[in-house]
Amino acid sequence: MNKIVLKDYLLLSNEEHKELLDIRNKEYIREVSLDTSIIEFINHISFVKGLKNSDRKFFAIIFEDKIIGGVNLFDTKGDIKWGIFFLNESNIMIKSIVPLYFLDYIFKTYKKEEIFLDVKKENINTISYDKNLGFNIFKEDDKIISMKMSKIAFESAKEKPFLKRVMKQLNKFDFEIISYKGVAF
């Protein structure tokens, strides 16, 4: 069976951090990120060290022993926000099932009724995909769209033909979350 590992940034080796940062600093990822700057290695390591006593969780997505992206969640005033990025060349099925798995993980682990995200207005593909997952726009300004999804909307979205196909594929993968046991929220 294929395996996907979500490995906490706090547990990555220096080489894994470099691999992850190389992906994060790609122009096509920076263009759609809320922070568009190129992140220097020393600043990245400093950021990661700050996660030890934080309510933010960041995971490298590893498939076939290669980092292919990252996913995160954090608590903002009691609300869970999440985000994700992938290498362009990553398998499209992996890019579809990891969000489903991770959102399910958030609902089950953190016992929240809603999950939130912020996305740049020009990131049309992400907005469309998030709507397919069950997210709805609840606030926007000239640059950012804020979306939320209830647990009920997520479960309902899984009944759509596209997500049903993805859910069938999800069962063909093993997932492992390797997490630093710091602050829990």
Q: Which positions does each model-derived feature cover?
A:
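Acyl-donor (CoA/ACP) binding surface of acyl/acetyltransferases
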Residues: 1-19, 26, 58, 62-185
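An amphipathic alpha-helix signature
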Residues: 14-21, 41, 45
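Conserved GNAT-fold acetyl-CoA-binding loop/helix
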Residues: 28-46
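Short loop/turn motifs at secondary-structure junctions and domain boundaries
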Residues: 49-54
